[in-house]
């Protein structure tokens, strides 16, 4: 690994690993090595969910469980994590196999998002829960300050459906047009057709559901509702 890139990443994270092998594992996709980051990702996913849930619970003492769940989903969803990964310039540090490198895996939202979760798991194992909680809250500070309860926290498919139903328009249709990759690491491409659009909008994701949500989000942006 390029030490300049690794040092830059650790500065952006606000954390220097004591166990360098944990950092390397967190950055390693399963296409590159059998010692990959999926177990760290599993751990990091749970830690992130806890930290964000705890922050929302204390920030919004009068908000009900439904709104808090929707806010948490917005903050921990794949495209939010991919945005954070790009802020860290994480793509340049990924360890990918030849196939993933050739297909542009360092830009794929699902890989970027999974790696952020793996880094969270790695930092926790390298330090303690207080340290990773402090870091996550720092990474999310602006997003936590800007988020608020309400309809905007409903998932994109629900919001698009409610918008169209409110105007007595047909519901959108979602069509899988491509599935790339092996069974354990697929990328779905969905075309979403919305009444009034001359062309379908496109969404991609690591599952059909995530790709449909991404397509719905693009439709909302086209309708200037996002």
From Swiss-Prot:
<keyword id="KW-0699">rRNA-binding</keyword>
<feature type="binding site">
    <location>
        <position position="114"/>
    </location>
    <ligand>
        <name>Mg(2+)</name>
    </ligand>
</feature>
<feature type="active site">
    <location>
        <position position="117"/>
    </location>
</feature>
<dbReference type="GO" id="GO:0008033">
    <property type="term" value="P:tRNA processing"/>
</dbReference>
<keyword id="KW-0378">Hydrolase</keyword>
<keyword id="KW-0694">RNA-binding</keyword>
<dbReference type="Pfam" id="PF00035">
    <property type="entry name" value="dsrm"/>
</dbReference>
<dbReference type="GO" id="GO:0019843">
    <property type="term" value="F:rRNA binding"/>
</dbReference>
<feature type="binding site">
    <location>
        <position position="117"/>
    </location>
    <ligand>
        <name>Mg(2+)</name>
    </ligand>
</feature>
<dbReference type="GO" id="GO:0046872">
    <property type="term" value="F:metal ion binding"/>
</dbReference>
<dbReference type="GO" id="GO:0010468">
    <property type="term" value="P:regulation of gene expression"/>
</dbReference>
<dbReference type="InterPro" id="IPR014720">
    <property type="entry name" value="dsRBD_dom"/>
</dbReference>
<keyword id="KW-0698">rRNA processing</keyword>
<feature type="binding site">
    <location>
        <position position="41"/>
    </location>
    <ligand>
        <name>Mg(2+)</name>
    </ligand>
</feature>
<dbReference type="Pfam" id="PF14622">
    <property type="entry name" value="Ribonucleas_3_3"/>
</dbReference>
<keyword id="KW-0479">Metal-binding</keyword>
<dbReference type="GO" id="GO:0006364">
    <property type="term" value="P:rRNA processing"/>
</dbReference>
<comment type="function">
    <text>Digests double-stranded RNA. Involved in the processing of primary rRNA transcript to yield the immediate precursors to the large and small rRNAs (23S and 16S). Processes some mRNAs, and tRNAs when they are encoded in the rRNA operon. Processes pre-crRNA and tracrRNA of type II CRISPR loci if present in the organism.</text>
</comment>
<feature type="domain" description="RNase III">
    <location>
        <begin position="6"/>
        <end position="128"/>
    </location>
</feature>
<dbReference type="InterPro" id="IPR011907">
    <property type="entry name" value="RNase_III"/>
</dbReference>
<keyword id="KW-0540">Nuclease</keyword>
<dbReference type="GO" id="GO:0004525">
    <property type="term" value="F:ribonuclease III activity"/>
</dbReference>
<dbReference type="GO" id="GO:0006397">
    <property type="term" value="P:mRNA processing"/>
</dbReference>
<keyword id="KW-0460">Magnesium</keyword>
<comment type="similarity">
    <text>Belongs to the ribonuclease III family.</text>
</comment>
<dbReference type="InterPro" id="IPR000999">
    <property type="entry name" value="RNase_III_dom"/>
</dbReference>
<dbReference type="GO" id="GO:0003725">
    <property type="term" value="F:double-stranded RNA binding"/>
</dbReference>
<protein>
    <recommendedName>
        <fullName>Ribonuclease 3</fullName>
        <ecNumber>3.1.26.3</ecNumber>
    </recommendedName>
</protein>
<keyword id="KW-0255">Endonuclease</keyword>
<dbReference type="GO" id="GO:0005737">
    <property type="term" value="C:cytoplasm"/>
</dbReference>
<keyword id="KW-0963">Cytoplasm</keyword>
<comment type="subunit">
    <text>Homodimer.</text>
</comment>
<keyword id="KW-0819">tRNA processing</keyword>
<feature type="active site">
    <location>
        <position position="45"/>
    </location>
</feature>
<feature type="domain" description="DRBM">
    <location>
        <begin position="155"/>
        <end position="225"/>
    </location>
</feature>
<dbReference type="InterPro" id="IPR036389">
    <property type="entry name" value="RNase_III_sf"/>
</dbReference>
<keyword id="KW-0507">mRNA processing</keyword>
